[in-house]
Amino acid sequence: MKITGVIVRIHKDRAIIRTDDNRLLAVKRHNDMMVGQIVSFDANEVHKVESKKYKYAASGKRIEKVQKTPKIKNFSRINNIKEFSRVDDIKNFSRVAATKETSQDSPQESKVENFSRVVDFSRVMNFSRVSNSKKNEIKNFSRISNIKNFSRIASIAAAFVLIFLFGRNVMLNNSSDSEYAYVSVDVNPSVEFTINSKHKVIVTSAINQDASEVLDGLELKEKDLKSALVMVLEKAESLGYISDDKNYVLVSMALNDKNKKTRDKREEKIDELKETIEQGIEALDNDTIVHRTVTVDLEERNKALENELSMGRYYLYLEAKEKGMDITIDEVKSSKISDLIEKIEDNTELAPTPTPVPPETPEPTPTPTASEATPSNSPVESKSPEAVPELGSREIEILGESVVLVTAYDENRKVVSQGSGFAVGTGLFATNYHLVKDGVVVKITAGDGKVYDVDGIVKYDKAKDLALLKTRVETGVNPLKLGTKKSLTKGSRIVAIGKANGAKNTVTKGSIKSLKVDGLTDAIELSASISKESTGGPVFDMKGNVVGITAYGISKQNVNAVIPADYVADWVKELSKHSFGNIRIVRKTLVFDSDFEFNFVVYKIIRALENEDAATYFGCMTDELYKDETRKNLEVLFTTYDLAYNIESINVVSKSEEQAKVSYVYTINKEAGPNFKNYRIIGECSLIKVDGTWKINDSEEKKEYIQ
């Protein structure tokens, strides 16, 4: 009967192996053995040790004999190993042969001769590097290198690697004390609470000087948000910041949606916070208070703090700017909240600050005729929006030739999504990320009816719903000229072109309704309607420049949202440094060809990890590779991290009727969760047919860390 385990140490001509049932056995070392390797061996290969002396035994003390089954007498307490970065930092290592103290002349290094470093890996914390150092020590545990066949169970998807890298204790370090959300309260004092998922205050910050006075003497840590809110407002009232007249209280909140669990239920979590805030305001029982609650995102919160503003004041600043008001950060800092809100609602100037007025020019006596044009070198006023010419039908038709149909298919050739896109370079097309994220195969149909296979995504941003696609071959579709959001103002006229009716272009004319959309970091609202099918298409200004990309469904308010083209322009500028053939794919899509069924097995298992689908993950492997422990590890992985698994390449190396080999490269990047180093996996797997279905039965991989 074969015994299976992982090599935990190599000493001279012996390999120390930790078996599946947690025994430690020594076998004869072979040349190809290395630490971390999974091996199988017969029971008669286990090395029998006779009368070994141990340096950790007191003078004259010995472990007389170690039998073939390596049960070392009284060797039962190697535990509580913390911060495993030093050889001698092992606690409770006191029960070797009932020894109470070590020999005086024993070395300081915690080493048992010929059997050093017996480690229960389930109790190791902060475990992040295995080194092939000749010394018997584990140091700076941030790399796993030269590990072949690291996991029988999850080598292809690196699930075991992740568990091994960080240890269960680190991965589960997601306590209720983590920063769950930020809530600011503005009367004139600006106070910010950092709360955990139980709505308990863990940090209180004074954003301005008035807030320091309010917080003085208040013990708010561990208070629930409702109570903390009441205490702050009552203190503000006692100091005269809340009077008998009408009082405005502005409450702003930002959810820390870097936390995966929080982001997945964002709307629900925001509603819970709003309810808690409402309860706090009601508990004051003060009819003079008029309160307003607003939501910002983390990026806006960071910008607010950079400008020494509360989230609420920064929100009002952005709102004023959107309405075209001439207002500065300093004015927002120094103004009363009530004045700010009322001025913005009335859309009047914040303060009677004098503005430069051009001197009056006497009216010319003779009225100039049309032929008396102003000299070109004379200063002239800018043309009003009405003076900007419309795009003509012929111009729109020419621009529309660069708009394409984007179609995503599943493995059964069924259309899963369809929308618009447009050319931004030779064989490069911009579109919405949501259109292609679930596509196994993606095709682009040009205006002339030609269909091109997409090789993959070269750039993408999930939050902004943008993706840049590269076709397998260069196309003849003319790229459009990209403009900028900076050229737009409220009321600017636009033209949107999409593929609402499949291959036929649809043209919609409208104007810029707003340069900001609630809940989105950077978006534009149009007066023109955007259909689901035309999403991903270009939005043009009256000069024919693409100033935005339509994004149907990105806003929860059902507004016609557009993402500024500036982001795509930055990508195109970066990629223009490379030839078409050297533009790297970061997220591969497949092609319906003779290799599809083999490539799809690798594609499917990696997508199962990203979709947190353990059933599909194991379904891609042979039954022999399944293990309950791996399933449990995956559950920990899925609940702790939000990882992006991006396939860069898949190629069939060899194939026959019953077996095949597929090479692949994919990356794992953290999007949310505890500390994690991103890395690239380069591997090759073997496939066999099981009841007519191709499954993975073996793989070999190399791993490298990436930025």
Curated annotation (Swiss-Prot):
Residues 345-392 are annotated as: Disordered. The keyword Acetylation does not apply. Residues 256-283 form a coiled coil. Residues 173-707 are extracellular. GO terms for molecular function: serine-type endopeptidase activity. GO terms for cellular component: plasma membrane. Residues 353-367 have a biased composition (Pro residues). The keyword Coiled coil applies. It is a single-pass membrane protein. Keywords: Cell membrane, Coiled coil, Membrane, Transmembrane, Transmembrane helix. InterPro entries: Anti-sigma_RsgI_N (IPR024449), Peptidase_S1_PA (IPR009003), Peptidase_S1C (IPR001940), RsgI_M (IPR055431). One of its GO terms (biological process) is proteolysis. Residues 368-379 have a biased composition (Low complexity). Residues 1-149 are cytoplasmic. The chain crosses the membrane at residues 150-172. SUPFAM superfamilies: Trypsin-like serine proteases. Pfam families: RsgI_M, RsgI_N, Trypsin_2. It is found in: Cell membrane. Residues 3-50 form the RsgI N-terminal anti-sigma domain. This is Anti-sigma-I factor RsgI9. It comes from Acetivibrio thermocellus (strain ATCC 27405 / DSM 1237 / JCM 9322 / NBRC 103400 / NCIMB 10682 / NRRL B-4536 / VPI 7372) (Clostridium thermocellum).
